[in-house]
Amino acid sequence: AVKYPVISVTAFGYRLEAAERVSRGLPVAGQAVVMTKWMGLEGTAVLAQEREAELLERYPFSITTAAKGFEKYLPVLPEAATALKSGATAMHDMRNGGVFGGLYELAGRLGVGLSIDLKKIPVKQETIEICEFFDLNPYGLLSGGSLLIVAEDGDGMVKALQEAGIPAAVIGRTTDNNDKVLHNGEEIRFLEPARPDEIGKVIA
């Protein structure tokens, strides 16, 4: 079994570990997909804690210290509460499988397609450095602490979250077909079903 910390989030009487349709009177396709904080937060924190000695062979202490500090970002109840008040259509608490896994599950649960801009997905430099060290894909790294929110007004949702002190960005939109498309500049690829989390390659 994989031995790493797993957080379980409960908000307002229901769990946010699967996509939840919050506002059932609204169509889901054609809405903005908002992501809070940064991808790979939980996995980065776990790797910095469990493999710090190895990381310090290449990186300064400041990198591992900052990465271990990502634990403070793991609670998602504040953004869930703000999203509910600000008209969220659906929410999904990302965990295993990283942002790619979270997006695939979100689309599947809601029965929509996706058009996602990879360059708009927020990531911390510490996550990039640590994933590079262990040869991991940061998009598939344990991402507890980040919430995916579907909303009619993506910019309005981002503004509400930022006013509450929660970093957020619009990373794409839902679509009315089953295609889950990832855009990276002019390059286009399709999102594949969630794979085992990248952290399992290092911590088993």
State what each model feature region is.
Residues 1-204:
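Helix-biased detector of long, well-ordered alpha-helical tracts
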